[in-house]
Amino acid sequence: MRILLNTLYVTTPEAYLSKDGLNVVISVKGDEVFRIPIHNIEQIVTFGYMGASPGLMKLCADSGVALTFLSPHGRYVGRLQGPTRGNVLLRKAQYKYAEDVDYSLHLSKLFIAAKIQNYRNILRRFVRDNGENSDVVLAAEELQKCKNRTFKATSVDSIRGIEGDAASTYFGVFAQLMLNQRDTFVFTGRNRRPPKDAVNAMLSFVYTLICNDMAAALETVGLDPYVGFMHTLRPGRASLALDMMEELRAYLGDRLVLSLINRKQITIKDFLQQGDEGVVMTDTGKKIILSAWQNRKKEQIVHPYLNEKVSIGLLPYIQSMLLARYIRRDIDDYPVFLIK
């Protein structure tokens, strides 16, 4: 159980939520493990299928505390919200700002500058841990130039172009970050739909996991994941989730893929070539990645803005909450997530 930004996160899948007077009570296998007065929180987010008592649901509704249910893996299930206009007003503000060119440009700059900086930090960490590599050093320097260009951009379209240049530079040296199995995990650049090699298959799969978590997080805080500021509206596309995941791709996705390859936790035998479908993962390969993904989300870091220890799996929810606060004008700017 963690309380962040006035939100109670119940991350134990076996937890059952009930009430005792005006207190929220968390129990695991019949034993009480946590309680908190309802008036101390604004929202409860629970990961699991054990559920909550009708009494607690009524208490939350009467107290204006949103109760959000997610699967143990973070997929959005549903949300109980009492008679409040908070989410309506938040989404109304979101839709208004999504049509505001200057507002969208500002957020787009933040999303992509953070993405590029996190690219740089991965390259710099590689050099720090493994010694000088001229190609990687030059790529990091080029990424700094791309980041500088981002802040000078005058349109979202130009930011997309800079993003493309940065991705080309970063993935141009990505293969050099693979210390093992480089002869079998051949990578010559980013490709998708379908992925043409095992590395791209893994990247696409992990990015999908991040996008799903981000969409669930946005739903949880009351934002519409389908209306973004940089990615254009398209039926069925979670544009805001795609916007928000940009700053997390390198930290959550790329590092996981590199770790699995370098530690030989996954091998080329976990992939198949399937004609027009390109390279796909076997069921065993998917299980390996999903297991590593869930373990990774349990690890703890100090959040750079909150300066608190949090599990990595909560990052999409924290960033979504911070964006909601920025849209509500509770904070002066949106604090992006940057790794060291």
Which residues are covered by each model-predicted region?
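Active-site helix-to-loop segments that bind/position phosphate- or nucleotide-bearing substrates
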Residues: 1-19, 29, 35, 87-226, ...
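Hydrophobic residues embedded in beta-strands of well-ordered beta-sheets
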Residues: 24-25
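Short, well-ordered turn and helix-capping elements at secondary-structure junctions
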Residues: 28-30, 48
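Extracellular/luminal Protease-associated
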Residues: 38-52
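Short alpha-helical basic/polar micro-motif
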Residues: 42, 54, 58, 208
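Short His-Asn-centered micro-motif
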Residues: 45-49, 70, 206
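Phosphate- and other anionic-substrate recognition elements at nucleic-acid/protein interfaces
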Residues: 52-54, 58-63, 67-109, 120
